[in-house]
Amino acid sequence: MNILITGIHGFVGSNLVIALKKRHILYGLDIVAPEKEGVVKTFAWEDIESTSFPMQRLPQFDAIIHLAGKAHDTKNQSVAQAYFDINTGLTQKIFDFFLESTAKKFIFFSSVKATADSVVGDALREDVIPTPIGPYGESKIAAENYILDKLKNKNEKLKLHDDRKQVYILRPCMIHGPGNKGNLNLLYNVVKKGIPWPLGDFENKRSFTSIDNLCYVVEGLLTKNVASGIYHMGDDEALSTNELITLMCEAMGKAPHIWKMNRKMMEGCAGLGTLLHLPLNTERLRKLTENYVVSNEKIKAALGIERMPVRAADGIMKTILSFSN
């Protein structure tokens, strides 16, 4: 297949190139265009403008994978409009191009944050009513809605079953792998310094997405006849912060320092921290200890598999081991 990947030089894009280059012909669309093994050519966004001359010379693509976007800023320092300009605006541009192109498949990388900042119930599923909080999630759901609106016909029914075009909206939870540090690296550095984890009394569960599992799913969507739709993406097993710390210590060859300090006492300290504007406050405690489990049952059923190829703990360990390299 001829595949166009936007944001091809980012973390996910680079891993997709490694996973797909042996069986497919890959092209990029990005703001930078360095030489990359396995990529025939990287185009600029101006090249897909309907008025541009290069657009007339673009290859005939079979599939488009849209990765380009502005990542979630955990420090909240980004201007809100930037999220909409990039996450929503670029999606509109590339999806319009897809509809006019010969490509048959479109994979859009959204996020679970487009649906919910917190999970109500045992797991986050595709039928949840989206209630994103903050410009990152809001810009992602706006992009999703643009795609869905474009797929509506005159009778206001979704044309998701059009055999000529198949559209997939992927909502992965936190993606990790060698080369992508993120929040896992922040926790790793705390553990590496020997700082005890005082919240061991909170046995929270969170879902993660191994980059290897993600590449496996994308390959499946490209090569199998999977129904168009919205699919959540995550590893099979959810892990607690205590389990993450234990895995990190195992990788470092040291004993974990997990303190199970009284839960009520820690909640009281966090409440006091809110009043006194201290680093540990009620909101930060909630973020550190809440459950965020994402169901991957729908995507597994669509691909006809019972399990993801990589266990959550194995994927996390692979990422952790890369931190010391």
Where are these regions (language model features)?
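NAD(P)H-binding glycine-rich loop region in Rossmannoid oxidoreductase-like domains
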Residues: 47-89, 93, 97
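Conserved Rossmann-fold NAD(P)-dependent oxidoreductase catalytic core, especially the SDR/UDP-sugar
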Residues: 93-135, 155-156
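Substrate-positioning beta->alpha
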Residues: 180-186, 200-222, 228-229
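Conserved C-terminal active-site "lid" loop/helix of NAD(P)H-dependent oxidoreductases
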Residues: 211, 246, 269-306
